[in-house]
Amino acid sequence: MEYKYNSDTLMHGVGFNFSKFESILSHGILSLECGKAENVRINRSFKGHNKDDEISMVRYLYIDAYDDFDIKLFNKEGAYYRYILNGISFIVEDVQFETQKAHRVDEVLVKNKVELDKIKGIQISDKYKDALLEDLFYFPMSKNYENIKNIGEEYIRYMASYGYEVNINEYKNLINELRYTYNALIDASKEDIEDLEDDYEDVLADLNEYMAQNISACFRKKFGYDITLYDLVIFLRNKNKVNLPIYIIPYTREKGKAK
């Protein structure tokens, strides 16, 4: 089953953040400002260029590469590759957007909120469809410690809602190590930055491994076996009583087409 995109079709990625995924199924896609107004907790993944009343999205029109398009540059600069192919995403239609202030080549900005009736489908790339939960990455490669900490706390609350408690001391040790590394990185001289960036990424990888094991254990406890990403997306969609089709999209893109 393939979705029939048009030039104004938009996409919004949530990574593998199942808490955010469920929140959108209940409330629509909210900006930080709307989240506060509606008492819905919204966490940033990155310190982006969008303001608190704006939502970052990808416009389908901008991902259709021309014959002379440098696909390596697109993968580096494009939001589609980073945030749509590498996670769960929503298809959005019939909303107004702005292009002038967007940061990435295929990014647009939507004001305030996307209502549920504007969301037309869910997307997962074929690379991750059958992946087990323990094999996914749950934190963005962000150099913003506060964002990472907020997302980690969100995951802990989310797992608690399913009756699963993490080893909080282990989490605190990892998040504190990330904070120490982050502070050292902020204060570093130019000569030390590269090594400290590597240290930061190593700690973030350890934190992701910790969270992946716990999220996997949380849903293993619920279902009695290890489920795939696709299985969980179906379960969460049905749990929230949302009748949205799920589309599997190709992970690999070539010049001018998807493969």
Locate predicted features.
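Active-site and NAD+-binding cores of ADP-ribose-processing enzymes
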Residues: 2-27, 37-38, 51-259
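Short glycine-centered helix-capping/turn motifs at secondary-structure transition points
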Residues: 28-32
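Short, surface-exposed loop/strand segments
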Residues: 33, 39-47
